[in-house]
Design a protein with these regions (language model features):
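N-terminal signal peptide
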Residues: 14-29
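Glycan-recognition and catalytic cores of secretory/periplasmic carbohydrate-active enzymes
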Residues: 26-300
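Classical eukaryotic N-terminal signal peptides for Sec-dependent ER targeting/secretion
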Residues: 1-13, 22
């Protein structure tokens, strides 16, 4: 899935060796090539109208009417692995992890000649998540139907399966996916706020506005999203919203320094988490790592 590939991008960058190892090494690992191919994957997963910079030339425009059933523009974003469905929950986690990778290791990505591609990958996902946040308390979390999609293997350019859009709102909450989307946009805002090549402070402020609204939406209307969108739960069943709310608060604090997010983190009753590894359904380890790097959040 795309979220797994995002984690791979971060891990490759964290390896810290983006050029060939010395000749005396017994094993040679070309991390630059691994990073390049990992990022190229996201271009192959693009939905919507493709840009002139598209490097995967065997892909074409697809799903150009997404959102039409609700009168909104939901074109763009990423397909999920081999599916033609756009699942908002793992897509948001993917954007968060890609952004984190750039925030921590953008210099190494630049040295490998891949920073621009990483920035483009984040922006492609973030642009879609902004579209999906159609109103302060409305978030579209899925386009397409997983069951019918899995029964019909076809190129996205040719697909004829249903493209229904599904949303969460105040009456049909999804605090887990709303908080994860808040985390994604806040993390992307941190990335684009950087005074570095590819920085875009105006864009970062726009992302941050959506992130703040989504966090408030998630806090004020608690409920797991599969109860509102059962078809999503058949494929990405959420176990809790506590980790996403904490994860979002940490990223929003990093992005803004606002005391309200610090207070939320300090008051979180489950900072320790469940001991599960970091993944699209469990963010406790990621939140712990970020808080540990900035432990004054809790102590001051």
């Amino acid at each position: 899935m795309a979220s797994t590939m995002a984690l791979l991008v971060a891990l490759v960058a964290m390896a810290g060796v983006l050029v060939s190892m010395p000749a005396c090494a017994m094993v040679r690992h070309d991390y630059a090539a691994a990073l390049s191919k990992s990022l190229l994957y996201f271009e192959a997963q693009r939905s919507g109208r493709l840009p002139p910079t598209q490097r995967v030339h065997w892909r074409g425009n697809s799903a150009l009417n997404d959102g039409a059933d609700h009168g909104v523009d939901l074109t763009g974003g990423y397909y999920d692995a081999g599916d033609n469905v756009k699942f908002g929950f793992p897509m948001a986690y993917t954007v968060t992890m890609l952004s984190w990778g750039v925030v921590e290791h953008g210099a190494r990505m630049a040295a490998a000649g891949e920073l621009r591609h990483a920035l483009e990958a984040v922006r492609w996902g973030a642009d879609y998540l902004v579209k999906a946040h159609a109103a302060a308390e409305t978030l579209y979390v899925q386009v397409g139907d997983g069951n019918s999609d899995h029964m019909c293997w076809e190129r996205p350019e040719d697909m004829d399966t249903p493209r229904n859009a599904y949303m969460v709102d105040a009456s049909h909450p999804g605090s887990d996916v709303a908080a994860e989307t808040a985390a994604a946009l806040a993390a992307a805002a941190v990335m684009f706020s950087a005074r570095a090549p590819g920085g875009d402070r105006q864009y970062a402020l726009r992302l941050l506005t959506h992130a703040k609204q989504l966090f408030e939406f998630a806090k004020n209307h608690r409920g797991l999203y599969q109860n509102s969108v059962p078809s999503a739960g058949n494929f990405y069943h959420s176990s809790s919203d506590e980790d996403e709310l904490l994860w979002a608060a940490v990223w929003l604090y990093i992005a803004t320094g606002d005391e309200e997010y610090k207070a939320y983190i300090a008051g979180a009753g489950n900072l320790g988490g469940s001991g599960q590894p970091l993944g699209w359904d469990n963010k406790h380890v990621g939140a712990q790592a970020l808080v540990a790097k900035a432990r004054y959040i809790i102590n001051h």
